[in-house]
Regions:
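Extended C-terminal subregions enriched in glycine
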Residues: 436, 478-529
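Active-site rim segments in enzyme catalytic domains, especially the processed small/beta chain
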Residues: 67-92, 239-241, 381-449, 479, ...
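Internal maturation/activation junctions in enzymes
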Residues: 287-388, 397-401, 416-417, 425, ...
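Bacterial N-terminal signal peptides that target proteins for export
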Residues: 1-11
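Noncatalytic scaffold domains of N-terminal-nucleophile
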Residues: 25-42, 46, 54-216, 220-222, ...
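Short beta-strand scaffold segments in enzyme catalytic cores
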Residues: 73-74, 78-85, 370-374, 444-446, ...
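C-terminal motif of bacterial Sec signal peptides marking the signal peptidase cleavage site
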Residues: 20-21
Length: 563
C-alpha cells in the first residue's frame, strides 16, 4: 500500500522501506528524499515538486525532523552538509556546535583529575552552542531558490497540528522518561507516557519556528528565543551566554576527497573524523580486491575489521578542530603510509589493538544522530547528518521553545585516553577549548562513478557511523547489491578500543562467529546492537534513482517518478 499524493499536478509516491520492492518496474525515479521520518521525507519531496532544488528541500526536511524526530532532529544541535551541484561542484558546510566561551579544558574533572560521570552528557553543562539554525540560513543565502518562509512553514504546521508517534518512537520516549523528568520536571512535553498512535502537538516549537521565519537567523540567536535558551541552560547548570549565541558562525570547508577504483568519493573534513577515516579504510582494503570474496565472509570481514581498527587508532591521536590544531590530512591519506599500517595484517590471526598504536606520520601543514539524502530532478545532490549527540542530547528541554538541547560537549576529550559515551578515545587534539568545535564521527558522503553522480549516503550511529557508511558503499560497488539491499545488509563494527568486533544481533552465522574467534577476534555478542540507520540514494548510468531507507528505524523514502 503505497501512499500517493499530488502536489502541483505531479504524482508523488511515499514509500516505506517495506514497500520499496513494490515500486512499478516501468516507472523511473527522477527525484528522491530519504530520511528518518515519513513526515520529513514527504515535506522534502513536496518542496522538490513545486520546483525547489535539493538545497531548498534540505532546509524543509531538516526543520521537519526537528519537529517529528526530537531525539536527533533539531534546532538545538548542529550538523554537516555535503553537496554536489548538477555540474559537479562539491563543497561542505560545517555547522557543528562549539564550546561556550566560558568552557575550559578541565571543566569535567574533579579535584583529583578524574572525569565526573555524567557531567558532559546530562544537563546544562553538557550543551554546546547550537549551529543548526545558522547553518540553514547560510545554505539558503548561498544556494536557496525558494523563500525561507516557504521552506519553514511545513514544519510550523507539523508542530502545531501534530505528528503521530510510532511504536519505536514510543519505546524511545519511555526509555528516556526518567531523565526527562530529572532535568525538566514531570510536566515536560515528552514525559507524558505517549503510546504508538498518539499525536504530539508542540505549540511552543511552532512559535519558535515562527520567530525564526519572521526574524531570520536573529529569531533564534537573539531576542526572546535566545533568552529562553540561555536561562534554561543556566537553570540546569550550564554556561552558554547570549554572546555565545550571537557570535556563532558556520564554516565552509573543503571536502575530503579520495579515489577507490573507479569511484571518486567526497566526505566531510575535520572536525568530522568521517572523511579521513573512510578514506583510510578504502585505501587500506584496496589491495585485497574484496569483490573476490562473498559478502560478510570471513575473509572480507577480516580485511575490513583490520582497516577499521587501524583507522580508529589514528582518529584517537590526530583529529580535532582544524581551526585550533594542525591535522596532517595528506599524510593520513597517503597510500604509502596506509600500506605500512596494514603491513602487520596476518590472515591467520587477529591483530591486537594493544599492538596497534596510532601511526607515526610526517606532519604537513586539516550515538544519536540523523541523516538524510536528497537528489533533485536537476541532478543536485545533498547529504546531511545532524545531531544532538546522545538521544535527546543533554535531555534539557527548553519548554518555552519546544526543543531539546545537545550534549555535544561529550564529544571533546574530557581527559586524554578516557572514552566518551560512545567508547571513543581522544587526545589533546580534541581537548576542550573556548569556541572550539568538538570532533565528530558524522560522515555525510557523496560518491561519483566514472565522473558521474552515483550515490548519496550517510547514517546516524555515534562511533558506528563511519563503518556503516564504509560498508554500505562496498555493498554496492564491490558486492553488487542494489541500494535497498545494501542498506538492509547486516553490519559489523570495530573501533580499535575496546578491542571487540561488534555484530548486529542474530544476523551472522554462528559458524562465522566461531571462525573469527578461532583466529583471535573478540566477538562481543553481549554488546551486539543495531548498527547505523543508513539512508541513501543510488544513481545509475541513465540517471535513474533508487533508494535505501533503513528498516532498523522508521525511515522512509519519498520519490517523484519521471513522466
Amino acid at each position: 500500500m503505497k501512499t500517493f499524493f499530488s502536489v502541483s499536478n505531479i504524482t508523488i509516491s511515499l514509500l516505506g522501506t517495506f514497500l520499496l520492492s513494490c515500486t512499478p518496474t516501468d516507472k523511473k525515479i527522477e527525484a528522491a528524499v530519504v530520511s528518518a521520518r515519513e513526515e520529513a521525507s514527504k515535506i522534502g519531496i513536496s518542496i522538490l515538486a513545486r520546483g525547489g532544488t535539493a538545497y531548498d528541500a534540505m532546509i524543509a526536511t531538516d526543520l521537519a525532523l526537528a519537529v517529528c524526530y526530537p531525539n536527533a532532529g533539531n534546532i538545538g544541535g548542529g550538523g554537516f552538509f555535503v553537496y554536489r551541484t548538477a555540474d559537479g561542484q562539491v563543497g561542505t558546510l560545517d555547522y557543528r556546535e562549539k564550546a561556550p566561551a566560558g568552557a575550559s579544558e578541565n571543566m569535567y574533572l574533579d579535584d583529583a583529575g578524574n572525569v565526573i560521570e555524567g557531567k558532559s552528557t546530562l544537563g546544562g553543562q553538557a550543551v554546546g552552542v547550537p549551529g543548526t539554525v545558522a547553518g540553514l540560513f547560510e545554505i539558503h543565502s548561498k544556494m536557496g531558490t525558494l523563500p525561507f518562509e516557504t521552506l519553514i512553514q511545513p514544519a510550523i504546521d507539523l508542530a502545531r497540528n501534530g505528528y503521530v508517534v510510532t511504536e519505536k518512537q514510543a519505546r524511545s520516549f519511555t526509555s528516556k522518561r526518567e531523565e526527562f523528568v530529572l532535568i525538566n520536571g514531570e510536566q515536560t512535553l515528552y514525559a507524558q507516557n505517549y503510546k504508538a498512535g498518539d499525536t504530539v502537538k508542540n505549540e511552543a516549537m511552532a512559535r519558535t519556528l515562527e520567530q525564526i521565519r519572521d526574524r531570520g537567523k536573529a529569531g533564534f540567536y537573539s531576542g526572546p528565543v535566545a533568552q529562553q535558551l540561555v536561562e534554561k541552560v543556566a537553570a540546569t547548570g550550564g554556561i552558554i551566554t547570549l554572546e555565545d549565541l550571537e557570535n556563532y558562525k558556520p564554516v565552509w570547508r573543503t571536502p575530503i576527497n579520495f579515489k577507490y577504483k573507479n569511484l571518486n568519493i567526497y566526505s566531510m573534513a575535520p572536525p568530522s573524523s568521517g572523511g579521513i577515516c573512510i578514506g583510510q579504510m578504502f585505501q587500506m582494503v584496496a589491495p585485497y580486491d574484496l569483490g573476490q570474496y562473498p559478502h560478510n565472509s570471513l575473509e572480507a570481514i577480516q580485511v575490513m575489521v583490520e582497516a577499521e581498527r587501524r583507522s580508529y587508532a589514528d582518529r584517537s591521536k590526530f583529529l580535532g578542530d582544524p581551526d585550533f590544531v594542525s591535522i596532517p590530512v595528506d599524510s593520513l591519506l597517503d597510500s604509502r603510509y596506509l600500506d605500512r599500517r596494514m603491513a602487520s595484517f596476518d590472515w591467520e590471526k587477529a591483530s591486537l589493538s594493544s599492538d596497534i598504536a596510532p601511526g607515526s606520520i610526517v606532519w604537513e601543514e586539516s550515538e544519536e544522530t540523523t541523516h538524510y539524502s536528497i537528489v533533485d530532478r536537476f541532478g543536485n545532490a545533498v547529504a546531511v547528518t545532524t545531531t544532538l549527540n546522545g538521544s535527546y542530547g543533554s535531555k534539557v528541554f527548553v519548554e518555552e521553545g519546544g526543543y531539546f538541547l545537545n550534549n555535544e560537549m561529550d564529544d571533546f576529550s574530557s581527559k586524554p585516553g578516557v572514552p566518551n559515551m560512545f567508547g571513543l578515545v581522544g587526545s589533546a587534539a580534541n581537548a576542550i577549548a573556548p569556541q572550539k568545535r568538538m570532533l565528530s564521527s558524522m560522515t555525510p558522503t557523496i560518491v561519483e562513478k566514472d565522473g558521474q553522480l552515483a550515490m548519496v549516503v550517510g547514517t546516524p550511529g555515534g562511533s558506528t557511523i563511519i563503518t556503516s557508511v564504509f560498508q554500505t558503499i562496498l555493498n554496492v560497488f564491490e558486492f553488487g547489491m542494489g541500494m535497498q539491499e545494501a542498506v538492509d545488509a547486516p553490519r559489523f563494527h570495530h573501533q580499535w578500543l575496546p578491542d571487540s568486533v561488534i555484530l548486529e544481533p542474530g544476523k551472522f552465522d554462528p559458524a562465522l562467529i566461531k571462525a573469527l574467534q578461532d583466529k583471535g577476534y573478540n566477538v562481543a555478542e553481549q554488546y551486539s546492537r543495531i548498527i547505523g540507520r543508513v539512508d541513501a540514494i543510488l544513481v545509475d548510468d541513465q540517471k535513474n534513482l533508487s533508494t535505501g531507507a533503513d528498516p532498523r528505524g522508521d525511515d522512509a523514502a519519498a520519490v517523484i517518478y519521471k513522466e
